[in-house]
UniProtKB/Swiss-Prot annotation:
It comes from Homo sapiens. Changing C180G: Abolishes RB1 binding. The gene is EID1. Ubiquitinated in U2OS osteosarcoma cells and is rapidly degraded by proteasome as cells exit the cell cycle exit. Residues 54-120 are annotated as: Interaction with NR0B2. Keywords: Cell cycle, Cytoplasm, Differentiation, Nucleus, Repressor, Transcription, Transcription regulation, Ubl conjugation. One of its GO terms (biological process) is negative regulation of DNA-templated transcription. Widely expressed. Most abundantly expressed in heart, skeletal muscle, pancreas, brain and testis. Expressed at much lower levels in placenta and peripheral blood leukocyte. Barely detectable in lung. PANTHER family: EP300-INTERACTING INHIBITOR OF DIFFERENTIATION 1, EP300-INTERACTING INHIBITOR OF DIFFERENTIATION 2-RELATED. Interacts via its LXCXE motif with the entire pocket region of RB1. Interacts with EP300, NR0B2 and TRIM27. Residues 52-63, 93-116 have a biased composition (Acidic residues). This is EP300-interacting inhibitor of differentiation 1. Its main location: nucleus. One of its GO terms (cellular component) is nucleoplasm.
Length: 187
């Protein structure tokens, strides 16, 4: 019974921890990225235990510069005086009218499939291609031979065959009697 009590306590603690993490609780301060200082404060949770809460930027963020060096423009600084808000321009960017298109890298990229195989790799590839051709040439006759060897095991609907045969014989006689074959030959 004590195991059940321990499990229920663990379940309650885990659900409390999950509820503390869920967004929209309102107990966490709303902060912008990179603002504030890094301070540790103790905050009581619903279960009564105190938890550590970190505020402010992380150490990696402090080590990196927050602003772009002077002379270079970043997206956070906004557009220059001559630019419209939705337009991004710089020394590195060229419009499609002024220079090459962006997808020209595909022309310069060497695809491994296009490289010539040399040595043992080429011989193995050629042998596999030859075996594939041989298989394709022998597959159909082998299937036909297998059918002929085991024809007694294959299903054959004699009634359907006889009906089809008689219908073709009747159609052929009717076309001869009516002279339809002469009309078909003229066209």
């Amino acid at each position: 019974m004590s195991e059940m009590a321990e499990l229920s306590e663990l379940y309650e603690e885990s659900s409390d921890l999950q509820m503390d993490v869920m967004p929209g609780e309102g107990d966490l301060p709303q902060m912008e990225v990179g603002s504030g200082s890094r301070e540790l404060s103790l905050r009581p949770s619903r279960s009564g235990a105190q938890q550590l809460e970190e505020e402010g930027p992380m150490e990696e963020e402090e080590a990196q510069p927050m602003a772009a060096p002077e002379g270079k423009r970043s997206l956070a600084n906004g557009p220059n005086a001559g630019e419209q808000p939705g337009q991004v321009a710089g020394a590195d960017f060229e419009s499609e009218d002024e220079g090459e298109e962006f997808d020209d890298w595909e022309d310069d990229y060497d695809y491994p499939e296009e490289e010539q195989l040399s040595g043992a790799g080429y011989r193995v590839s050629a042998a596999l291609e030859e075996a594939d051709k041989m298989f394709l040439r022998t597959r159909e006759p082998a299937l036909d031979g297998g059918f002929q060897m085991h024809y007694e095991k294959t299903p054959f609907d004699q009634l359907a065959f006889i009906e089809e045969l008689f219908s073709l014989m009747v159609v052929n006689r009717l076309t001869e009697e009516l002279g339809c074959d002469e009309i078909i030959d003229r066209e």
